[in-house]
Amino acid sequence: MHRISQGFYWALRFFWPLVFYDLLAGAAGKIFGRDCVWLALFGAALAAIPVLYAVWRYRQNRGRRAGIREILTAFAEGMVLGVILNLLMAACGLAEYSGSYEKAAEYMFAMPLALQLLGMCILAPLAEELLFRGLAYTQLRETCPMWAAAVLSALYFGAAHGNIAQGIYGFLVGLCLAKSYEDKGLAGAVAMHMGANTGAVLLQLFFTA
């Protein structure tokens, strides 16, 4: 019975941040409607960030503070990673097999550039790194070696995206983000995630110009 209670507590502690984030996104979607999906997602991220950060600080999670040079390096690495993976996905035609991915991409890249940069390159990386690396990865590291925690948190990150194309992309990026979090702390992981999303936005602009 004690082990069951411990397992339930562990699962509750692990999954509630994602459930909380999804509930915020659902509530924002009801408020703003389907025509403003981007506004709902960004509103959810903005509302989730202070809560997730407070929990991350309360748990006194692992991860050292990165310097400015390390943060800039992580951002540049993220941009390169984002561009390479998006080009590989396009070359493999992976997106064509996922209608939900194409629909999501259509919504996101139809936004004005300023909103794409604000939402996809700032708010979403902050919220997602707090959730998937700051909380989920760190909890896994309490009982798993680094490589296992990286793989499991990357699978969790990929699955949360809800379609095959973004799931594979999220898993591969998630592995790199876990390593960045381990080496450079939360700021390094956030910077790499921001760089990856910025690379994707710039690549989209290049091909649609």
Task: Give a label for each model feature.
Residues M1-T73, M79-V83, A91, T198-A209:
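N-terminal, membrane-interfacial amphipathic/helix-forming hydrophobic leader that caps
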Residues R3-G7, A11, F15, V37, ...:
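Hydrophobic, aromatic-rich alpha-helical transmembrane segments
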Residues G33-R34, Y97, A105, T138-A148:
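Membrane interface segments of multi-pass transport proteins and intramembrane proteases
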Residues R34-L41, S100-E106, F171-L175:
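Non-cytosolic membrane-interface motifs at loop->transmembrane helix junctions
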Residues R59-A124, E142:
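Juxtamembrane helix-loop-helix connectors linking adjacent transmembrane helices
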Residues V83, L113-A209:
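Transmembrane helix-loop-helix hairpins at the membrane interface
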